[in-house]
Amino acid sequence: MFQNVIIGQYVQGNSFLHKLDPRSKLISVFILLIIIFFADNWFSSLLLVGLTVMLMAISRVPLLFLYRGLRPILWLVLFTLILHILLTKEGPVLMTLGPIAIHEGGVMNGLFIATRLLTLVMLTSLITLTTSPIDLTDGLESLFTPLKKVGLPAHELALMMSIALRFIPTFMQETEKILKAQMARGVDFSSGPISKRVKALLPLLVPLFISAFKRAEDLALAMEARGYRGGEGRTKLRVLMWNGKDSFVVVSALVIGVGIILLRNG
């Protein structure tokens, strides 16, 4: 299940989003991610959900791939929803399950936060799904260029963020392998109280971190063997080109953001 997480994965394609400059995608998604937290009503929230679904359709990423990738996230969304339903005591009581009273405010807040969380994940995934690792690194480096004036290494920061994003699927695959190995040895992760399940998961941390550090070391050695010495003096085979489509996308994101802020204040 974990190996299907879509964050950090790239799907090769020829869609409108794939052809955009990575900088325009990064700027637009960053604007929309901020605006999500300004959307404090259902109309604004559903508007962002509709926009996200439309962008996913434009990306032409296979629906089955999206479903498999979002399935692990749905457990977190469901957990968030249940937590709000159980802990929020606002509004009239809808039903009572033994000692637990379910309030209207809890259900509405839970659905609202769950929708926001799912939108955040889908928007973040759009960047990596439609942007190759090289383009993503180049785009981040270009956006970080002003940081050079204060002595920060723009290329190294961009490379670090790109590697971190791409490492997520690998990390999830490693978690899945270790889980299956432990289950083959008779460890039960699916039954018993929550405290017992958490204790059963703790032994996974050591091999998981060892594997993560081993992969990081292998990557560092591979980069060093290929002569990587940082971004200073490096040239690029492909130069990023900003055009009218990129300006349109960024301006559209700004207009949507301003509209949602006006709805909030209105």
Curated annotation (Swiss-Prot):
Tree of life domain: Bacteria
InterPro entries (alphabetical): ABC/ECF_trnsptr_transmembrane (IPR003339), EcfT (IPR024919)
Record has Endoplasmic reticulum as a keyword: no
Main localisation: membrane
Q: Does the keyword Cell membrane apply?
A: yes
Task: Name one cellular component (GO) term.
Answer: plasma membrane
Provide a Gene Ontology MF annotation, just one. transmembrane transporter activity
| Protein's job | Transmembrane (T) component of an energy-coupling factor (ECF) ABC-transporter complex. Unlike classic ABC transporters this ECF transporter provides the energy necessary to transport a number of different substrates.
HAMAP family under this entry?
A: EcfT (MF_01461)
Record's subunit section: Forms a stable energy-coupling factor (ECF) transporter complex composed of 2 membrane-embedded substrate-binding proteins (S component), 2 ATP-binding proteins (A component) and 2 transmembrane proteins (T component). May be able to interact with more than 1 S component at a time.
Family membership noted in the UniProt record = Belongs to the energy-coupling factor EcfT family.
Protein's name according to its UniProt entry: Energy-coupling factor transporter transmembrane protein EcfT
Organism (species): Alkalihalophilus pseudofirmus (strain ATCC BAA-2126 / JCM 17055 / OF4)
> What would be the name of the gene that encodes this protein?
ecfT
